[in-house]
Amino acid sequence: MSDRKTIADSKRAFNHDFPHVIPSLYRRTTDELLVELHLLSHQKHFHPDALFAIGLSQVFDVFTSGYRPEAHVKTLFDALCRSCGFDPNALRKQAQQTLESVRGHDLEEVQGWIQQQGKGAPEALAKALRNTAGSTTFHYSRLMAVGLLSLLASAQGDESSDPEKLSQIAHELSESVGFSKARVEKDLNLYKSNLEKMAQAVELTEQILESERRKREQNESAKLNTGSSEQMSQGVEACSNIS
């Protein structure tokens, strides 16, 4: 990520790797992620650690829910990352390994690891926590806050399935990982708000598509019935002529 690209360069690289029309429902998210990744690629003290990888993967996966054609989703993620100098496969692997490292552990234990800045935690998580909590120069990204929230959600326990409780815990733990409480609260509130709006938009889109599908089926059925009626009428007329 050493080349000093402009945003125009990153967009050009993205369009080269993903030469497809993006549905309007997903265009804004794509543009925002592209700009954010571009800006992060120029931050001297930014490192794509596990919390960032988890957050990026989570935001992308959630906000591309229902994307069609499905085959384009992976290509879209890859193009976003590569156009800004990030390795999509490495980020996905990093996110997956870190999330898997906390599965099977209860939420209280995971909280303890975070509060102790990675002490006793699986190496994948400990490394990410050392990067943030142990540094005064690291560059924060809102995707890291989402990564922290998603990490907590992967732990076992009833509280792990309670979004409000998880957000509260993430807020309380933010300073332990070197994040600003105010920033984390703001970023997670915005994330949840956008999540609700996106879910509603996807649901509405699916309803519209389903309605259009039914109309097409009804029209096709009507055409078939009309054709059958015409054929029957012609047959009756032919019989009458013979008589």
From Swiss-Prot:
GO cellular component: plasma membrane-derived thylakoid photosystem II
GO biological processes: photosystem II assembly
Keyword Ligase tagged: no
Bias kind Basic and acidic residues: ranges: 210-220
Protein name: Protein Thf1
Organism: Prochlorococcus marinus (strain MIT 9313)
Family membership noted in the UniProt record: Belongs to the THF1 family.
Record's compositionally biased regions (Polar residues): 221-243
Region (Disordered): 210-243
Function comment: May be involved in photosynthetic membrane biogenesis.
Coiled coil regions in record: 180-224
Disulfide feature: none
UniProt superkingdom: Bacteria
Keywords, sorted A to Z: Coiled coil
Transmembrane segment boundaries: none
